Structure formats: C-alpha cells, structure tokens
Amino acid sequence: MFAGPYGLIYDYSIERERLMRAVGRAVWGIDMSVLYASMEVTGRVTDGATILDVPCGGGVAFRALRSDQDVRYIAADLSEEMLARARRRATQQSLSRVEFAVADMRALPFADEEADLFLSYNGLHMLDDPERAVTEIARCLKPGGELVGTSLLAEGSWQQRALIGIGRRRGFPVPPSRRNLRRWLTATGIAEPEIEPDQGLAVFRGHKKQTED
C-alpha cells in the first residue's frame, strides 16, 4: 500500500517494535503493542490452513510464522517495492513456503472462500473506498474463517486528529470511523466483529458466519 519514501519509513519503523511503540505513544497517542500482539495468531493456526496476508507490506506479520509450519501462506501487496522487502524478510526467517502476489485489496485475485485466516494490517485506512476492500476480504474467507487486522480510525487522540488533517491536505484518505468499520464487517458476514481497544488504532477481528444448510 505504500511506495517510495513513505514505504521506506513505514517499513523501517514497523519492523522495530520498541521504536514503533515509542513513536505511537509520543506522536499518535496510541498503544502500538496491540498490533504486534494480534500477529501471534499466525503461530496458532492448524496444519493445512491457508493464510492470506493483504497488504503484507514488508512482511511484518511473518514474525510469528515458523519455518516448519504446515500452512499455505500467501503474502500480497499492490506495491512491488513492498513485496521485494517481504521476500527478503521471508529469506531472513527461512520461510521458503511463503507465496507472493501483486494484489489490490479492492479486487483480490483469490478464489471465493479460499482463506482460513485473513490478515490485513494497516491497509484499510490507506484506501478511498475501504468498504469495497472489506467486501473482498469477506468473499475470500471460508465460512468459519478468521479475520484479524488493524486500521487507524477517524476517532482518536488530538495528535492523531491533527496528523489526519495534515495527511488529508497531502492527499491521504481519511480513516474509517469505528461505526462504519463495524457496519461494513457485519454487512459482509463477519459475525459480532470486535474492534478494540478504544483508541485511534484498533485491532478488528471476527469469524465469517457459517453457511446455513
């Protein structure tokens, strides 16, 4: 989702948890630890599962993935630059099974009901039409499949609101509101979605409803 200097800064920062937690508190007024804690889900999936990671960025969500883990992991991003970084990260972690793909969150090149777990970190707030991306994510999830991701929200600290205003003047989209994100998730079949904590960066998670017989 990022490219050029913004991508470089983002990737450098997000890979350094202590730095990102300090920056999150001081600059954005948010607790970044919730993002890193949510990524532990990848280490708990069952053998044979399919994981879609979109946008994968530089591969930050690989951190809990084990080299011997028997899963199909597809890391996708719209940015070739980010995918190159993700490939390097996979090599550094000896993750030889990770597959890579160029993909737009608003039109994912994956089959219906393909994923047991869908990861989506810090992508929705970079889109002009995040609702469309949520619809695509739900389409790709199997019934009972799990969604875990993060997004900046329109609500937040005074620091965050000020930075959102600066970003808007530079052409960045306004992040979704908590209410709209919950509405989109529910409308696309994510049962009782959780959006926590009550701050400007939230982890959203939930399971796709099972198909009725």
Describe every region a protein language model picked out.
Residues 131-143:
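A short glycine-rich, Lys/Arg-flanked "PGG" loop and its adjoining helix->strand segment in the class I
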Residues 106-117:
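A short acidic, Gly/Pro-enriched loop at the edge of an enzyme's catalytic core
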Residues 189-213:
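Core SAM-dependent methyltransferase catalytic element
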Residues 1-45, 64, 148-170:
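Conserved class I S-adenosyl-L-methionine
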Residues 50-107:
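Class I SAM-dependent methyltransferase SAM/SAH-binding core
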Residues 173-188:
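Short alpha-helix
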Residues 117-129:
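A short SAM/SAH-binding and catalytic strip from SAM-dependent methyltransferases
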